[in-house]
Amino acid sequence: MQTHIKINRGELLRGIEQDHTRQLPDFRPGDTVRVDTKVREGNRTRSQAFEGVVIAINGSGSRKSFTVRKISFGEGVERVFPFASPLVNQVTIVERGKVRRAKLYYLRELRGKAARIKSDRSRVMKDAARAQQDKANASASQAAAAQADVTVISAAPEVAPETQGE
């Protein structure tokens, strides 16, 4: 007698991939980002920055990656970074860009001023407001923690003065 067990492979993969996902800032194609990566040279490691425009985001789950393009000494250079890579230390958003495409491969043919991307001021303002709100929440939680410490100290049982010296 054979029993067949049904396994939903998509659910199984999502469960495994959740362990490998990292929290990176929310960026889109058109944004200018600075990616700090670990570079190993011989027996020492150092950090190297790559700053450019995100021209594509590909894949999903643990296979998700993004492509960054910059112009270095007059030549276009593109690098693909996996989101889940342990070699990516940090991704910093330098500037928010306003584009109407998900893939910006057309930037490869453009040069100079034609390759510029408009700044998305509304997203910049939202980011600033979110950062200010996060700062306020952090200071409020610190104040609440300090208040909780004060109440714990004042709630300690007092020892009677006549039994203190014995």
From Swiss-Prot:
Part of the 50S ribosomal subunit. Forms a cluster with proteins L3 and L14. HAMAP family: Ribosomal_bL19. One of its GO terms (molecular function) is rRNA binding. SUPFAM superfamilies: Translation proteins SH3-like domain (SSF50104). Keywords: Ribonucleoprotein, Ribosomal protein, RNA-binding, rRNA-binding. GO terms for cellular component: cytosolic large ribosomal subunit. This is Large ribosomal subunit protein bL19. It holds the Pfam family Ribosomal_L19. This protein is located at the 30S-50S ribosomal subunit interface and may play a role in the structure and function of the aminoacyl-tRNA binding site. Binds the 23S rRNA. GO terms for biological process: translation. PANTHER family: LARGE RIBOSOMAL SUBUNIT PROTEIN BL19M, RIBOSOMAL PROTEIN L19. Belongs to the bacterial ribosomal protein bL19 family.
